[in-house]
């Protein structure tokens, strides 16, 4: 993600949990307000700018950001683009995986792991988190939400790696979201494969 301030361009790099936390807190607090109000207070705008500064790793100060984003629309737009960037990175990872069809593979610490069969026990752990977090109104995730996703990933992969190892590997928030969503994609892919194989068991058609 890029931003231009006072004729200088900056890149955010990975949007880590530390960077994301401030943004998520501000986004959630303003989301409800946005439904009932069409304006933002000075404090609201300050918090948006602070979140932008943090997402860009404090490469510029609050004052520099506030001066560079000299229109209200610029503050709101660049703040909103943070979520768009995360979704864009998630989509890029999905496109790369679609090329390889490796929906049951995750790389942790330079090593590839396969999820193996997803039975009821593993599926239950995933489903509980999925049902709580994947809803139309859910736009951001707390640290606890992200922890739950990572724990579900670890369990789906039969604890072949630890939570700590997975959390270190999935440093970008988009990586956590993507690999969690990939679990469902893998189940759907396996269903399609099994359905294709099962056709030979159907009665012959006249």
Segment roles from a protein language model:
Residues 14-103, 114-206:
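Short, surface-exposed, charged amphipathic helix/loop patches that serve as local interaction elements
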Residues 1-6:
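Short, intrinsically disordered N-terminal pre-domain segments
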Residues 7-9, 110-112:
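Residue-level detection of beta-strand-connecting loop/turn positions
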Residues 107:
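Acidic surface patches and DE-rich sequence motifs
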């Amino acid at each position: 993600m890029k931003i231009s301030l006072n004729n200088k361009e900056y890149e955010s790099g990975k949007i880590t949990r530390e960077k994301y936390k401030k943004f998520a807190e501000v986004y959630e607090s303003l989301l409800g307000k946005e439904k009932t109000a069409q304006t933002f207070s000075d404090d609201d705008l300050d918090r948006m700018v602070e979140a932008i500064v943090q997402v860009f790793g404090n490469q510029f100060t609050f004052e520099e950001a506030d001066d560079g984003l000299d229109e209200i629309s610029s503050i709101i737009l660049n703040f909103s683009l943070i979520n768009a960037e995360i979704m864009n990175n998630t989509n890029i990872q999905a496109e790369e995986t679609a090329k390889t069809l490796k929906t049951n593979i995750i790389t942790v610490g330079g090593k590839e792991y396969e999820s193996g069969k997803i039975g009821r026990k593993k599926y239950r752990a995933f489903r509980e988190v999925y049902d709580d977090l994947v809803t139309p109104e859910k736009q951001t995730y707390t640290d606890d939400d992200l922890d739950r996703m990572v724990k579900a990933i670890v369990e789906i992969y039969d604890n072949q790696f630890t939570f700590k190892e997975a959390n270190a590997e999935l440093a970008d928030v988009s990586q956590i979201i993507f690999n969690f969503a990939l679990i469902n994609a893998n189940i759907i892919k396996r269903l399609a494969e099994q359905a294709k194989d099962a056709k030979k068991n159907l009665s012959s058609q006249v």
